[in-house]
């Protein structure tokens, strides 16, 4: 299984490590969908994060390596259920939640290069709106 992912978000490029040992099913499901193209918007309930709302999209995974408190640079996948399916990236303090209350998502991907641009991406998304994002090998 490939362990590194290139992420282009807005004008920034990041390198990220798949957490294959901690979230093998989530990583495999995500890899099968690469290249993955979407847009990020700023979170509404969770703090300093951006997210990809995915509605009823199914990755076919349950919970593994799940958390409500991702650290900056960590991506989590919420597989759906109480709220819609989503991918969230923390750029600052996050307490993952929706209007239904606290949620937990699978930490499956961690930025390892480009962290110095993470806060700028978050603030750009907050003040300028949706940004394109592409995940690829």
Set out the residue ranges of the language-model regions.
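N-terminal intrinsically disordered, low-complexity, charge/repeat-rich segments that act as generic
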Residues: 1-22
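Glycine-rich active-site loops that engage anionic ligands at enzyme catalytic sites
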Residues: 18-137
